[in-house]
Swiss-Prot record:
Its main location: cytoplasm. GO terms for cellular component: cytoplasm. GO terms for biological process: CTP biosynthetic process; GTP biosynthetic process; UTP biosynthetic process. The keyword ATP-binding applies. The active site is at 117 (pros-phosphohistidine intermediate). Major role in the synthesis of nucleoside triphosphates other than ATP. The ATP gamma phosphate is transferred to the NDP beta phosphate via a ping-pong mechanism, using a phosphorylated active-site intermediate. It is an enzyme of class 2 (transferase). Keywords: ATP-binding, Cytoplasm, Kinase, Magnesium, Metal-binding, Nucleotide metabolism, Nucleotide-binding, Phosphoprotein, Transferase. Its EC number is 2.7.4.6. Belongs to the NDK family. Its cofactor is Mg(2+). This is Nucleoside diphosphate kinase. ATP binds at residues 11, 59, 87, 93, 104, 114.
Length: 142
């Protein structure tokens, strides 16, 4: 299995509900390493850049408004097949359809307040992490 990195962002609903520690603990228990971690309040411009692939879709404005409504916690995780592993751990976008045991299945309130975002491909990772981190903020091997 290839060692790779993925970008993860705990959305404002997850931060406000005090789920940050539990979510990070799940990733660490799965053997993923935190390579970068940051809490911030996204600007509209940053949110639009992060979700650029959804521009023009009916939900784009609501999504941007939601992720700029409170602080988020962004991180880069590294591990074997990290992108696939994290996507399986978080569950489908619609938390109502996410199975119990997944992050969204356990914590999402609806399709919008679904607690977490994660890259779905290497290309997404390369684009998304740059909204939050410069390369010199990513920790090397430890």
């Amino acid at each position: 299995m290839p060692v790779e990195r993925t970008f993860v962002m705990i959305k404002p609903d997850g931060v406000k509900r005090g789920l940050v520690g539990e979510i990070i603990a799940r990733f660490e228990r799965k053997g993923l390493k935190i390579k970068a971690l940051k809490m911030k309040w996204l600007t509209r411009e940053e949110a639009e850049k992060l979700y650029e692939v959804h521009r023009g879709k009916p939900f784009f404005e609501d999504l941007v408004n939601f992720v700029t409504s409170g602080p988020v916690v962004a991180m880069i995780l590294e591990g074997d097949s990290a992108i696939e592993v994290v996507r399986l751990m978080i569950g489908p976008t619609d938390g109502r359809k996410a199975p119990p045991g997944t992050i969204r299945g356990d914590y999402a309130l609806d399709i919008g307040a679904n607690v977490i975002h994660a890259s779905d491909s290497k290309e997404s990772y390369e684009r998304e992490y740059k909204v939050f981190f410069s390369d010199d903020e990513i920790v090397g091997d430890y």
